[in-house]
């Protein structure tokens, strides 16, 4: 592979990064944080049974969390869920 092709590939990847990076930053983010309240409930991959709360788009609802994995849309109490996710 010639130097011209390598430089062209580097230039292409650099432009692609500059164009797509702002979109990646703004998708599902609020105040610079990932908007975990928009994620679905996720039990995780383990088999434990912890009662947690998640935001379903309208309100906070209970779900059973397996104890590991999952995502950030899980809260130990309804109050914590509402504080983080409910819109005033």
Swiss-Prot record:
UniProt organism field: Cyriopagopus schmidti (Chinese bird spider)
Miscellaneous: Negative results: the recombinant toxin does not show activity on Kv1.1/KCNA1, Kv1.2/KCNA2, Kv1.3/KCNA3, Kv2.1/KCNB1 and Kv4.3/KCND3 channels, as well as on calcium (Cav) and sodium channels (Nav). It also does not show detectable activity on thrombin.
Protein name per UniProt: Kunitz-type kappaPI-theraphotoxin-Hs1c
CDD domains: Kunitz_huwentoxin (cd22598)
InterPro entries: Kunitz_BPTI (IPR002223), Kunitz_BPTI_sf (IPR036880), Prtase_inh_Kunz-CS (IPR020901), TFPI/VKTCI-like (IPR050098)
Cellular component, GO annotation: extracellular space
Database matches in PROSITE patterns: BPTI_KUNITZ_1, BPTI_KUNITZ_2
Intrachain disulfide bonds: 37-85, 46-68, 60-81
Pfam families (alphabetical): Kunitz_BPTI
Residues annotated as site: Reactive bond for trypsin: 47-48
